[in-house]
C-alpha cells in the first residue's frame, strides 16, 4: 500500500 499518511507525518 502507499504510505501517503506516513510521508505526510514527517
From Swiss-Prot:
GO terms for cellular component: extracellular region. It comes from the Eukaryota. The keyword Cell division does not apply. Keywords: Adaptive immunity, Blood coagulation, Coiled coil, Disulfide bond, Hemostasis, Immunity, Innate immunity, Secreted. It is found in: Secreted. One of its GO terms (biological process) is blood coagulation. Conversion of fibrinogen to fibrin is triggered by thrombin, which cleaves fibrinopeptides A and B from alpha and beta chains, and thus exposes the N-terminal polymerization sites responsible for the formation of the soft clot. A long coiled coil structure formed by 3 polypeptide chains connects the central nodule to the C-terminal domains (distal nodules). The long C-terminal ends of the alpha chains fold back, contributing a fourth strand to the coiled coil structure. Cleaved by the protease thrombin to yield monomers which, together with fibrinogen alpha (FGA) and fibrinogen gamma (FGG), polymerize to form an insoluble fibrin matrix. Fibrin has a major function in hemostasis as one of the primary components of blood clots. In addition, functions during the early stages of wound repair to stabilize the lesion and guide cell migration during re-epithelialization. Was originally thought to be essential for platelet aggregation, based on in vitro studies using anticoagulated blood. Heterohexamer; disulfide linked. Contains 2 sets of 3 non-identical chains (alpha, beta and gamma). The 2 heterotrimers are in head to head conformation with the N-termini in a small central domain. This is Fibrinogen beta chain. It comes from Ceratotherium simum.
Amino acid at each position: 500500500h502507499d504510505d501517503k499518511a506516513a510521508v505526510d507525518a514527517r
